[in-house]
Amino acid sequence: MSVQDYLSAVKIGKKEYHACVNKGTYPYLPVLEDIIDESSIDREVSLGSDQIPLRLVVGTCTAGRTTAFADNFMPILDWGTEFSAKWASLSDSQVNEGIRDDIKVYEYMNKFYVLEGNKRVSVLKYFKAVTVSAQVIRKIPKYSDDPDVKTVSYTHLTLPTIL
């Protein structure tokens, strides 16, 4: 079953990839290190482990894995790679016992970027899970006159409770 799930996920991923290309938008996962300059970060705060909404997991931290996924976290690599075998194995694990290990994410401006666990997120999104258990590190931006940054006050926020 896991091979069929992978091939189905790839079909979804490639459809999304081509839709993005046709619209002229970036077809891969957003990469946090391309979005922010570390010099714009005041500090990082560990928020520990919590359930986070998968709909707010929007990208990855580094560019290394991004081209394996369409921007909806579905895989786009053909079957027969080490990546596809690991994805299929995670799919079996999810069906048989559930994925139990926390992923690791950075939270920035109420969105989450995966540091460890991109394939787990992909599998969970494929199976339409609502949340994922994650170790969360918040990146707190330096004070800025940018209205997008000013609207988010990080001094008192906990994890978003938007489920």
Model region roles, listed by residue range:
Residues 129-131:
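Ligand-binding loop in jelly-roll beta-barrel domains
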Residues 134-149:
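Long, charge-dense
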Residues 1-109, 115-119, 125-126:
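Short, charged/polar connector segments at secondary-structure boundaries
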Residues 124-127, 145-146:
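A short, polar/proline- and glycine-enriched secondary-structure boundary/capping micro-motif
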Residues 155-161:
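Conserved small/polar residues in nucleotide/adenosyl-binding loops
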Residues 151-153:
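Acidic, proline/serine/threonine- and glycine-rich low-complexity intrinsically disordered segments
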